[in-house]
């Protein structure tokens, strides 16, 4: 009988290593959440107010309104600006479709606009008929916010992937009439469930957002001012975000080190903007003309490697666009994402670097 060769399991380096994060801070999250649960606060307890205050203060905003998820934050922000139904709202063609769906759900028309080399919306390509803009700061990169501001229409910044990004001394979420955050499990600070937030400097818009978040009702009122959502984070989710924020600076430092090392050791161009004051590096993206071959090579090496986003907004059957979208289509076809979480070991980083050479 022939001798059987031993079977070895390939090393698997996951894109998101939330299991390691939980091992590191899970007990701390649970302890903080339990302190609220013991007082009977499943939602909307003192911890929620603490989170909103911390986010507003840290990101240089006057108001922060937490929501059930990042998509709800976009929904609420778009409804808060009270545009006439059917208004044209411009959004980056290169983004996760939630950014466009929120526009459609609010009863408006989605106008997909091409991106520039940063993967963010090209301000020069925004039609003059646009009543507002949803500017997605993708992969931790940042839009040309000064140019967007000069358009003279409401700007909503989707900062779901750029929580810690800074350019010219301002956080991504400091820009726009309103800005939106997400704390889903794929984000750099996770709620271990769902969660999001809307930030603004306007007292009126903040009040609108709080009303829209809770069935259209003002706090301590039984009367609805209009239709609204039921969009709140649980005490556990709030505890997870607060705990994550405490460690976020050192996590960011590690992600930045990894990003710089992989960029310097790669034969492929890196799509992340290293010229910012600070990049979140929420996703580390490289470019290759033989992208599909590279992705296959990574998988053969036991390394997670994915494409964000294979389906662009204008590719969705429910949306159409008359604009030129050649840059976003080109970038979509050459881009791939590699692991970059702060939990990677030095050995794993070296393995990824070898796959990039």
Predicted segment positions?
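Conserved PLP-binding active-site segment in aminotransferase class I/II-type PLP enzymes
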Residues: 1-76, 80, 84, 260, ...
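PLP-dependent aminotransferase class I/II
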Residues: 19, 46-54, 58-62, 134-136, ...
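Active-site phosphate-binding strand-loop segment of PLP-dependent enzymes
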Residues: 117-191, 197-199
């Amino acid at each position: 009988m022939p001798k059987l060769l031993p079977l070895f399991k390939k090393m698997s380096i996951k894109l998101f290593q939330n299991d390691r994060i939980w091992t590191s801070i899970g007990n701390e999250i649970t302890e903080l959440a339990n302190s609220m649960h013991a007082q009977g606060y499943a939602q909307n307890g003192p911890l929620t107010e603490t989170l909103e205050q911390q986010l507003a203060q840290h990101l240089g905003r006057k108001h922060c309104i937490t929501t059930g998820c990042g998509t709800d934050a976009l929904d609420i922000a778009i409804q808060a600006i009270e545009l006439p139904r059917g208004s044209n709202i411009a959004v980056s063609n290169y983004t996760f479709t939630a950014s466009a769906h929120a526009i459609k759900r609010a009863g408006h028309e989605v106008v997909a606009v091409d991106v520039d080399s940063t993967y963010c919306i090209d301000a020069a390509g925004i039609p003059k008929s646009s009543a507002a803009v949803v500017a997605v700061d993708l992969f931790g990169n940042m839009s040309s916010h000064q140019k967007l501001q000069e358009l003279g229409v409401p700007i909503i910044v989707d900062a779901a992937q750029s929580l810690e990004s800074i350019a010219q001394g301002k956080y991504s979420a400091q820009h726009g009439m309103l800005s939106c955050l997400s704390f889903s499990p794929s984000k750099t600070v996770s709620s271990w469930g769902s969660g999001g937030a809307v930030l603004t400097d306007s007292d009126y818009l903040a009040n609108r957002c709080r009303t829209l978040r809770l069935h259209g009702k003002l706090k301590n009122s039984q009367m609805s001012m209009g239709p609204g959502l039921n969009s709140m984070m649980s005490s556990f989710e709030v505890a997870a975000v607060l705990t994550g924020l405490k460690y976020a600076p050192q996590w960011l430092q590690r992600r930045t080190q990894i990003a710089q090392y992989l960029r310097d050791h790669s034969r492929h161009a890196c799509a992340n903007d290293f010229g910012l004051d600070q990049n979140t590096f929420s996703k580390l993206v490289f470019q290759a003309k033989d992208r599909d071959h590279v992705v296959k090579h990574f998988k053969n090496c036991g390394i997670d490697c994915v494409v964000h986003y294979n389906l662009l907004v204008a590719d969705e059957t429910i949306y159409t666009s008359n604009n030129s979208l050649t840059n976003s289509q080109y970038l979509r076809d050459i881009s791939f994402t590699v692991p970059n979480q702060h939990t990677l070991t030095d050995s794993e980083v070296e393995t990824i670097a070898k796959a990039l050479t």
